[in-house]
Amino acid sequence: MGADNELSEFEKQRLANIAERDALLKKLSLDAQSSGLFPPKSARSSPGGQTKPKKKPPPKKVKKEDEHPVPRRMSSRLRGLAADSEVAKRKADEQYEAAQQAERAKRVRKSDAFSFSEMLVSGQKLSGDSLIGVDVVTKGVAMPYQRTFGDEDIKKTTDKELKALREEMSGLRLWEAWEPNRIKLTPERIYTMTFHPSEAKPLIFAGDKMGNLGVLDASQEKPTSAVKQEDDEDAEDDDPDPVLTTLKPHTRTISSLHIHPSKPTHLYSASYDSSIRELDLEKTTSVEKYAPESTSDDIPISGIDMAPDDPNTLYWTTLDGAFGRYDTRASRRSAVATWQLSEKKIGGFSLFPTHPHFFATASLDRTMRLWDIRKLSHDDPVPVGEHVSRLSVSHAAFNSAGQIATSSYDDTLKIYDFGSKGIAAWEPGYTLSDAEMKPDTIVRHNCQTGRWVTILRPQWQANPQSSIQRFCIGNMNRFVDVYSSSGDQLAQLGGDGITAVPAVAVFHRSTNWIAGGTASGKICLWM
């Protein structure tokens, strides 16, 4: 027991000494660290034997005052400044007005006479003899490429004359010299087209949205050197485009073109710039034939027509719903007569060719109206009769047989036969009842053109070679449809290379040539 107690006392003393020594060493270590003699103990090493360095705390950012501080937004009152001066305000108003006036100036019509060089936009110089020839100087949904009329319909035709005409019209083929997507006749969307009356060669005129006039002589042939050989890979790059001419006689949309058959060297064009101009195809000059007295008067013209027996009198309609007449041989002040026929725009009109005192109008107010100039009051004009459609009527086209074809946004083509009702013998003041004004034939046709396609309008052939009257109209499925006056479809013209809707479709007045114009300024020609 004694030994155990002694060891125990000894052990206690030893432990006390160890504790005292450790305390002394710890005190010395702390004193040394505080004086900077030794670095602090390193962190424990990781299991892999590598020590992980401690992240250094980011240095404290000391906010420095900017030598040139950015001024804060403050009101003029807090800055102690006076309100903007009247001079500054007036200057800003003048700059704005100048910009607006410059924009308006681009759209104001030019009343001066133009030479060819002043109108030329692109293409070759026009030559009167080579251009027109010696003989002339004398609601549906569009389904692209889906046909609604074809060979099977022709085979089922029992009427011999109708079948022969269907075969003839369906036999028309696209101009082979160039594909339609190569024939860009105008820079912008085509609004109107017409053929020159010459039968010697197809000569086409097209007016676009910006006042450009395109001219194409389709008798030209592709140069033989440009014909691509099967084994020549580079021939396509050398293939020239057709020779075209582009003029700019107007500052705004050309809405209508007309060539009088007894005056074939003169082309009349009507425009939204409120003017009607005459282009002399021999002299290649353009002069203004009609316009409001002031250039500031904005009266866009929507259509133009002339009586076959009178090459001097112009008839027109406006987007304001007015109808006008002017004998170009007299002064404008005394010879211009106008009638306000509608509160809304008249989109299209035409004269009855054989009795031009009758004319038909199509309006945004959903009406097709028949008028007689012999009994037309300026104060309260009353039509011979009118027919109201479900939606707006785009155009009303008269043919030589006294029939009117209209297109409407209710997706119908309507045909009114006033020839069978004795229109040629009607006396001034004759009127028709609502029942007598109903259409004789209604054809379903998709007329939903939308914003980017020109409105579809029917156009008759002026002098057909057979007793069957016929008209053409664009088809939203990228065709041109041909119908008879009884509503029978005669043809549906298409072909390779037609990449857009040929919305503007026109017949040559006597030959079975048909042209269609697209929103990209390109044309298709069937012959």
UniProtKB/Swiss-Prot annotation:
> Which GO molecular function terms does the record list?
DNA binding
A single Pfam family it belongs to is WD40
Write out the biased-composition intervals (Basic residues): 52-62
Identify the stretches annotated as WD repeats. 185-226, 249-289, 296-336, 341-381, 388-427, 450-493, 496-527
Q: Where is this region: Disordered?
A: 32-98, 216-247
Origin superkingdom? Eukaryota
This protein's record includes keyword Repeat:
yes
Against Gene3D superfamilies, the record matches this protein to:
YVTN repeat-like/Quinoprotein amine dehydrogenase (2.130.10.10)
- Quote the biased-composition stretches of kind Acidic residues, using this chain's numbering: 230-241
Name the keywords, alphabetized.
DNA damage, DNA-binding, Repeat, WD repeat
The entry's cellular-component GO terms read: chromatin; cytoplasm; nuclear periphery; nucleus
GO annotation terms (biological process): DNA damage response; regulation of DNA damage checkpoint
**Biological function:** DNA-binding protein that binds to both single- and double-stranded DNA. Binds preferentially to UV-damaged DNA. May be involved in DNA-metabolic processes.
Q: Which family does it belong to?
A: Belongs to the WD repeat DDB2/WDR76 family.
Q: Please identify the protein, giving its name as recorded.
A: DNA damage-binding protein cmr1
Q: Which organism is it from?
A: Aspergillus fumigatus (strain ATCC MYA-4609 / CBS 101355 / FGSC A1100 / Af293)
